[in-house]
UniProtKB/Swiss-Prot annotation:
Record's protein name: Probable ergothioneine transporter EgtUBC
Chain ranges passing through the membrane: 25-45, 59-79, 84-104, 148-168, 178-198, 209-229
Family: In the N-terminal section; belongs to the binding-protein-dependent transport system permease family.
Pfam family, one: OpuAC
PROSITE patterns according to UniProt: ABC_TM1
GO biological process: glycine betaine transport
Gene Ontology MF terms: amino acid binding; transmembrane transporter activity
Biological source species: Enterococcus faecalis (strain ATCC 700802 / V583)
Chief location bin: membrane
Recorded topology in the membrane: Multi-pass membrane protein
Localization terms from the record: Membrane
Length: 505
């Protein structure tokens, strides 16, 4: 409990931002879902054959896995809030549509006949008594949709839309139960709170509706005002990072250097998502800058990657030239360390089987159970390369990055993919095997920025290049250890390093 409280207060500003983002996503999605579903239900009461088909279709929408739906929407809409809102609206349609339709079609026919006898038009019947009588059903549908939206909105963090899911993802990535509890409990509490609020409005009278509408308006308006205030400065730069401690440390270094050496104000978006999300966000102007790796550029982003030897400078020049030509992006000078892919095993396992190189795994391949990330499994410089160059066909389980370390520590797998600067290598007493067939290209970290942004703020090149050739693998691994294992704040770790190297006052 003490750790939970300390984590909460240490991250209270991030928490407030995530809570506001979560509420915005939920409110906007619920509003759009209600504006679509309620009028549609009214229309369907006069077209009952069509109603059955549409209810089945909206019901099918709810069976689509949320991650799959987000994945389908990304190529069409992009990343960030738009696809998250569309997905949440799709999930919320069915309960509101079904309940509204049920409420309107179960009104006593004798009341309908009496209304017609009094000469009421369809519009008059609808607004004078039908909606009033169906209101408990409508509110019930909205309550169900609200709980569904607030819970599902945690997945929005996977595509850079923010929300309380960022705490859950970060907690999983860093094996930090406090962060997971903060995100999960807050989401659950928010769902309960709004469920109660809507239940209070269920017994609606004019006064309650006015109060409820005013509170909702103030919350929405206040949250947007907060966002506007935090992003209203003229010289504003948004820097994002991938999941994990290392990108978090690096972007905090960028922020500290930029704000000390210029009048540009920096907004950070740590744990923004995986590689392709950040790359697409940069191209669509949702972010201005993020740290990327030279090997990733060659293997993932370039449409026609050149065949290169594994010399770091050669790979950097090819990555820089390729991005400039293909997307008009600028890859600034790289840091010294290489956070390359590696194959890791427990030290005791390596000693028992005399493993020093990846090729040594061939002699015990039938005993191996591998835990690889999905990205590693699908990459040419990952498991595909292990199959082609090392002729390794293993029993492979796909895992999230943080979970594979827990799996090898618990003996559930005995070989994993890793990054050479991961703090978990030291934490769990793992060793990396020599890449004796030179499968993995160099992965030097460097700032990736739109050329247009660099033209707008030309001073950024000189500022960010202060890190060029700096940070060894040992130093980066130690900083990762301080954040992941010792629980230090990434911004403090970043500033301490910069001060130690006389890059920051």
């Amino acid at each position: 409990m003490q750790a939970l409280i300390e984590t909460f207060f240490a991250r209270k500003e991030e928490y407030l931002q995530a809570l506001i983002e979560h509420m915005q996503l939920s409110f906007i999605s619920l509003l759009f879902a209600a504006l679509i579903a309620i009028p549609l239900a009214i229309y369907l009461t006069s077209h009952r054959k069509l109603a059955e088909s549409l209810l089945q279709v909206t019901g099918i929408f709810q069976t689509i896995p949320s991650l799959a739906l987000l994945g389908l929407l990304i190529p069409l809409i992009g990343i960030g809030r738009p696809p998250a809102i569309v997905a949440l609206v799709i999930y919320a349609l069915f309960p509101i549509l079904q309940n509204t339709y049920t409420g309107l079609t179960e009104i006593d026919p004798s009341l309908e006949e009496a209304a017609e006898a009094f000469g009421m038009s369809k519009k008059e019947k609808l607004f004078k008594f039908e909606l009033q009588m169906a209101l408990p059903f409508i509110i019930s549908g909205i309550r169900t949709a609200t709980v569904l939206i607030i819970g599902t909105a945690t997945l929005a963090a996977l595509i850079g839309a923010g929300g309380l899911g960022t705490f859950i993802l970060l907690g999983i990535d860093r094996n930090n139960l406090s962060l997971i509890f903060i995100g999960a409990l807050s989401s659950a509490a928010l769902a309960v709170l709004f469920n109660y609020g809507i239940h209070w409005l269920e017994k609606a009278n004019g006064r309650r509706l006015i109060i409820g509408g005013t509170i909702l308006g103030l919350l929405l308006g206040g949250s947007f005002f907060w966002n506007q205030q935090t992003s209203s400065k003229e010289k504003q730069l948004t820097i994002a990072g991938k999941l994990g401690a290392e990108p978090d440390i690096i972007i905090n270094m960028y922020k500290a250097l930029i704000e000390e050496n210029s009048d540009i104000q920096v907004t950070l978006k740590p744990n923004f998502g995986k590689t392709t999300f950040l790359y697409n966000a940069l191209k669509s102007d949702e972010i201005d800058l993020y740290p990327e790796f030279t090997g990733t550029v060659i293997e993932t982003f370039l449409k026609n990657p050149p065949q290169l030897d594994n010399q770091p400078q050669v790979v950097y020049e090819a990555a820089r030239a390729g991005l400039k030509k293909q997307e008009n992006l600028t890859l600034l000078k790289p840091m010294r360390y290489e956070n390359t892919y590696a194959v890791a095993v427990k030290r005791s396992f390596a000693k028992a089987h005399q493993l020093k190189t990846i090729s040594d795994l061939q002699k015990i391949s039938n005993q191996l159970k591998a835990g690889f990330t999905l990205e590693f499994i699908d990459r040419q410089d990952g498991y595909k390369g292990l199959q082609e160059k090392y002729h390794l066909n293993l029993n492979v389980q796909s895992m999230e990055p943080a979970l594979r370390y827990q799996a090898i520590n618990n003996g559930e797998v005995n070989v994993i993919d890793a990054y050479s600067t991961d703090s978990e290598l030291r934490q769990y007493d793992l060793v990396t095997l020599e890449d004796d067939q030179a499968l993995f290209p160099p992965y030097q970290g460097a700032p990736l920025i739109k050329t247009a942004t660099l033209e707008k703020y030309p001073e950024l090149a000189e500022i960010l290049n202060k890190l060029a050739g700096k940070i060894s693998e040992e130093e980066m691994s130690e900083m990762n250890y301080q954040v992941n294992v010792e629980g230090q704040d990434p911004s403090i770790v970043a500033k301490d390093y910069l001060k130690e190297k006389n890059l920051l006052k």
